[in-house]
A protein has these predicted regions:
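Glycoside hydrolase catalytic-domain context in secreted enzymes
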Residues: 17-180
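Sec-dependent N-terminal signal peptides
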Residues: 5-14
Length: 180
């Protein structure tokens, strides 16, 4: 009996070695991120700071493109719902409507990302990182990007910006993770 147990000892010792600690989903995200950062070399960290991140295969990090835009819908990755420009959304004075719109935007973005990921495609405009909202206050009509803002009212702009983020990120009680 002792001999059989001794033969199984290496199996038990090595069975816990298969997964890196930072991949342990039962640990808090902050702890996992810290553990992963300790594993990355300086060169790998720098490579992950680009809009198009190459994979770090030795750690199981897949390629990712951080460049996506959802100013008024998911941009440039096939068909999507196109909502009014932010200046038009602000004219509604309805933060709740903006929230509902960006809830739809995040659902579309998640679906598109799932499709492209299943095709092993990681191109620009296929990720889950959205460059929105623009919360600059529109003060000078000569600024050509004024329509990308929620106007000149700081209070309204702040309410609209908050609802955009809440719509995109969701409430964490859904069936899947939204855009975090």
């Amino acid at each position: 009996m002792k001999q059989k147990l001794l033969c199984l000892l290496p199996f038990f010792l090595l069975s816990g070695c298969g997964q890196a600690t930072y991949k342990n989903a039962s640990l808090p995200a902050e702890e996992r991120a810290g553990l992963l950062l300790k594993e990355l070399t300086l060169e790998e960290k720098v490579s992950l700071m680009m809009d198009s991140s190459k994979p770090v295969e030795r750690l199981g990090i897949k390629p990712y493109n951080w460049w996506n835009e959802a100013l008024h819908g998911v941009a440039r990755a096939g068909l999507a719902t196109v909502f009014p420009q932010p200046i038009g959304m602000a004219a509604s004075f309805s933060p709740e409507t903006v929230y509902e719109g960006f809830t739809a935007v995040s659902d579309e973005a998640r679906a598109k990302n799932a499709y492209y990921t299943s095709q092993e495609s990681h191109e620009r405009y296929q990720g889950l990182t959205m460059w929105t909202p623009t919360v600059n206050i529109y003060r000078d009509p000569r600024w050509g990007r004024g329509i990308e803002t929620y106007g000149e009212d700081p209070y309204l702009t702040s309410r609209m910006g908050v609802m955009v983020v809440k719509g995109l990120q969701g409430t964490n009680d859904g069936k899947y993770d939204k855009l975090h």
